Amino acid sequence: SIRSLEENLYDYAQKKLRILSGLYGILKPFDVIQPYRLEMGTNTVNLINSDLYKFWKEDVSKTLNEEIKNNGSAFLFNLSSKEYFSVINHKKISVKTINFDFKTKLNDEYKNIGMQIKKMRGSMAKFIIDNRIESIEPLKKFQVNNFKFEKILPESNTLLFTS
């Protein structure tokens, strides 16, 4: 929750954090919206003659690029799910996208555990805002709920954290 931040970080979060939405496209933390339940993958062809990915792709990508330019950001830190991030036209993003993966060791094998991943994405977003992180190196210091930095997967620009 945005309210878990120190008040002096509200402006920074409002400037830097974006939330992808199936209904609203792209949101800032303090945008006022009505509660809703609509997944990006919901079949909307009969309603809007398009799926939500196609409907939002150009607007969301254009808005993100404008905000990246206005904020002077060097990276786009992607903490969204693959489902939601596929709404972005990656070829049109003007900076390098940094992805995150959180895996848990179970029976000598690393696995993604859905609810843990959601919690860790939120924790990482808070860590980035709390520390005003705008480069890759400080992200490696993230340690929450036994998750710690493992390595960078260069082929996908992914920072892997394991527990």
Region roles according to the model:
Residues 2-155:
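Internal, well-folded beta-alpha domain core
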Residues 156-163:
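Short, basic/aromatic-enriched C-terminal tail that caps enzymatic domains
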